[in-house]
Structures are given as structure tokens and as C-alpha cells.
């Protein structure tokens, strides 16, 4: 069976995730550090390029998944430099990674994984159940995420309700993430985007889960009104 573990796109979270969950900080304060830029922690030699075809071929920059190290609780980038403030190491996964060897993930000193539930309301990730089941069997704690395609609070609420229904029966020990990066949503006002995020997070919180908003620094600076969250 082909294993695509080495293709997994990793995201590394700054700060103490467990502590943030325990004190239940407002969603706007958790992992919304404007001074943290993913690019600042990546050495140039860590980047690799991959071809992506959909009629025409284009290349996109990816991070070599073998580049980061965690040694004795300290995180290092590919140049061997300590990443300030980073104390935990994880990844997100979806059907794009294919079949994942979760035992290998566990052996690779991965502290957690976020598993995609869906792409909006139109596409439920077909590897979600397999990933949630096998991650738990391998002893890898999981959170979940929804790649939002919402353009209104009504749709954001439905995305949250879908997430809640899909998590039934699974052990979700890390946050439920609202992934804001869709190009269509970037055309909305910051107020509307923030209201969508708040709607999603409130519904998830009411169901007993801990919500979190994921976005890149561009979205953080330009498309979200954090005073509303």
C-alpha cells in the first residue's frame, strides 16, 4: 500500500496549546499572534516545489515535511536554529495526503494532528473517518477543521453543525478549527467574515468543543476584525 506520510503538510503551532485550552481564552487570543509569521521560522533550504496540474501546470511552494525537528522538547528549523516560543509540533491532514501511516506519524514525534472534516458543505473529506480512527489507535491526539467556503453567517452555522455531527463518536481532544482562506470570502467585509467566524465558534462551543480560527498572516491583518471575536 502506498504511503504518503512524507507528503503531509505540517503546521507548527506557537505557544502552549494545552494551556490555552485549559484556560479557555477567547477565540481571538488563541494562536492569533500578529508577531508570529510561519515564514520566519522556515529556513530557505526547507522549501521544495511540487507541480500541480488542472489543465495548466503551476508550481507552489511547500515546506519539506522532514525539515523541522523537536529534540528534548525544543523545536528547530532546517538550519538547526531554535524556533522561539514553539513548544509543540503537529500537522494537518486531508484526503490530499492519501493513506497515512499513523504509527509512523506517532514515531516521528508528532504531538497532534488536525483532521479535515470537509470543504465547506459541498464536499466531506472521504478520509476523515479513517484518519480519526487510525490516529486514535496510534495514540495521536486530534483536533478537526472545516475549510470554510461560507459567504454568510447562515452557511457558517451549517458548517459548524456539520462538524458537530461528524465528530460524534470520536475523541476530539484538540480544537475544532474554522479555516478561513477561501478566495471568495476575502471579498467580503472584515465585519462579515468575523461574524461568520463567531457564528461557527459559538455553535461549536455550545456543543462542548473548543473552537479556534485558523488563518494566515495576510488574513489576520486584512480580512478579520478581531475586536468582534
Give the predicted meaning of each segment:
Residues 37-94, 98-103:
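N-terminal carbohydrate-binding accessory modules
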Residues 7-21:
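Sec-dependent N-terminal signal peptides
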Residues 220-229:
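Substrate-binding cleft/loops of secretory-pathway carbohydrate-active enzymes
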Residues 208-221:
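Aromatic-lined carbohydrate-recognition surfaces of secreted/lumenal glycan-active proteins
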Residues 73-210:
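Substrate-binding cleft of extracellular glycoside hydrolase catalytic domains
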Residues 1-7:
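N-terminal secretory signal peptides that target proteins for export/translocation
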